[in-house]
Amino acid sequence: MIKKLEIKSDNKLQNLTSYHGISIIDSRQHLSSIFGCPRRIDSGDKKVTYMWEFVYTNEKGEEVGITLYDWKMSKVVTETARINWHIGSKGKSKAEEFAKYIGEKYNLEISSEDYDL
């Protein structure tokens, strides 16, 4: 269970997380109304355009870094288009915990390749 969730903007998590098959399906506009504006990433390879960074504290008191980002949306995607936003973490269990928490708290649609959230 997540005890505390913070939105970060210090760019420290971008290369420290990876995707574990869990996504949120929603529009940038709706997610921005919940989490504030995402950080725009101007990566040369165009793999990520927008990203939020979070740190949450779990029941054990551990701080966990999470990224939420659009992956390989090379075509122009409108602000209201519903797309898959990848959840990046340092382990699948952390991504699952985050997805379950924000899915329930904000009534967000979660997609998972092999886990029933």
Q: Where is each model-derived feature located?
A:
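Residues within mature, well-folded domains
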Residues: 1-117
